[in-house]
Amino acid sequence: MKIQLIAVGTKMPAWVERGFEEYRRRFPKDMPFELVEIGAGKRGKNADIPRILQKEGEAMLAAAGRSRLVTLDIPGKPWTTEQLAVQLEAWKLDGRDVALLVGGPEGLSPECKAAAEQSWSLSPLTLPHPLVRVLVAESLYRACSITTNHPYHRE
């Protein structure tokens, strides 16, 4: 099973790239984890936000292909680390790749939300999108360490 983090936005600060890469490289070879960046639509005073969301959503769905879609969204379901580990195991048994979708400043398109099989909430707080990348990478790695009995996670 491959996991993709499909996120709107490019040109992240160096600390985001380093933080994401630190956890990405730790993933086991049989569970590759990759970042797919989607260019953000140009936003300005007179920007057509619904159209921008639609275009970003189309690009995200195209990048995901036939993967299981999981949105990262405040109204989604919060998972503990242990529950995320159970989700990882369930996703493995499903046999499909997994695409985690992170929207831009206005969130995800209605099409992405409608196509998703699951929605995961990292927090009821609004988090900066660059930080979400690092949080997701660490959370998934921690959950993976539980499933493989690696000592990274301690209770």
From Swiss-Prot:
Organism: Aeromonas salmonicida (strain A449)
Keywords from the named record: Cytoplasm, Methyltransferase, rRNA processing, S-adenosyl-L-methionine, Transferase
Gene that encodes it: rlmH
UniProt-annotated binding residues for S-adenosyl-L-methionine: 72, 103, 122-127
Record's GO cellular component terms: cytoplasm
Enzyme Commission (EC) number: 2.1.1.177
Enzyme's top EC category: transferase
Annotated catalysed reactions: pseudouridine(1915) in 23S rRNA + S-adenosyl-L-methionine = N(3)-methylpseudouridine(1915) in 23S rRNA + S-adenosyl-L-homocysteine + H(+)
GO molecular function, one term: rRNA (pseudouridine-N3-)-methyltransferase activity
PANTHER family (UniProt xref): METHYLTRANSFERASE, RIBOSOMAL RNA LARGE SUBUNIT METHYLTRANSFERASE H
Cited InterPro entries: Alpha/beta_knot_MTases, RlmH-like, tRNA_m1G_MTases_N
Compartments in which it is found: Cytoplasm
Assembly information from the UniProt record: Homodimer.
Protein name: Ribosomal RNA large subunit methyltransferase H
Protein family: Belongs to the RNA methyltransferase RlmH family.
Entry function: Specifically methylates the pseudouridine at position 1915 (m3Psi1915) in 23S rRNA.
CDD domains on file: RlmH-like (cd18081)
HAMAP family: 23SrRNA_methyltr_H (MF_00658)
Signal peptide (residue range): none
